[in-house]
Amino acid sequence: MISLRRPKPLSLVTGAAGFIGSNLVDYLLEQGHQVVCVDNESANNDKFYWNKDTYNVSGDITDYKTMKNAFTNVDYVFHLAAESRLQPAIENPIGAVEKNCVGTTVMLQCAREAGVKRFVYSSTSSAYGNNPYPNIETQPDDCLNPYSASKAAGEKFCKMYTDLYGLETVVLRYFNVFGDRSPTRGQYAPVIGIFQRQKDAGQALTIVGDGSQRRDFVHVKDVARANYMAATSPLLYHDQIDNHLGEVFNVGSGTCYTIQQIANAISLNQTYIPERKGEMNTTFADITKIDKLIGWKPEIDVLDWLK
């Protein structure tokens, strides 16, 4: 339970029972924060990871009344809840907009009304689309599907709430996140999780296309640390001229590997399936900005982790 005297910072995490959110909750607790966890368990994950040392709220981020009640005395908000995978968003673009645009605006408004110190928004590298790589934050958006378009719209709402209302926001564009608790089946499973499940079941790894697609993989523990540093770093605001609040920061490894390389590191029992529309060929982050302004660098390499 949350102490009424609140001797520690209080953070609210949406999507807190999922893959990235639950790892972030663990990290915040390690840093001495109290945590309010919000999740509606709609992601069709293998498992949900509610933490017994937090105050847990089962609710939808589009429900303003329920969300507003969860914001009492909150210092920091980490907004991860989303329609977060490509194929579900392509099949149901209205649902993606409701969750990723309306839900994000509800959270921003609740944060504004509660007077939180800073709001950290989890976004996606897919907003870069077919821009030249490595992707840098100054590139224009090139959204190829409803998922990336709706997440990029959420970024614009964050910037607007900073400029218009003075709410401190930071946008983190994740590249391909991997690590413990990654989903291994269903629409929300990333490629490494799918490959690991297939290997454990004695099945061939299903490689989309020819496996030449390149991905920038970043470990979930590095992502959790990036969130914490983005929320607490004083480096983002010095004065009205040197102000980086409301801006986008890449969270990636700064390197990339082909899907074929990842598959080979897991199992040589492989098969190939047709390419899917709306997917990018390469994700590759330039992480100069987040290193310079927040002091974050990744620590875990995907091929080392897979050994």
Predicted features by range, described:
Residues 50, 59, 184-188, 244, ...:
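Residue-level signature of the cytosolic catalytic core of signaling kinases
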Residues 200-307:
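C-terminal substrate-binding subdomain of Rossmann-fold SDR/epimerase-dehydratase oxidoreductases
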Residues 85, 124-127, 131, 187, ...:
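Activation loop
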Residues 1-177, 221, 231, 296:
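N-terminal Rossmann-like NAD(P)+-binding domain of SDR-like oxidoreductases, especially those catalyzing
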Residues 133, 156-215, 220-232, 264-267:
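NAD(P)-dependent short-chain dehydrogenase/reductase
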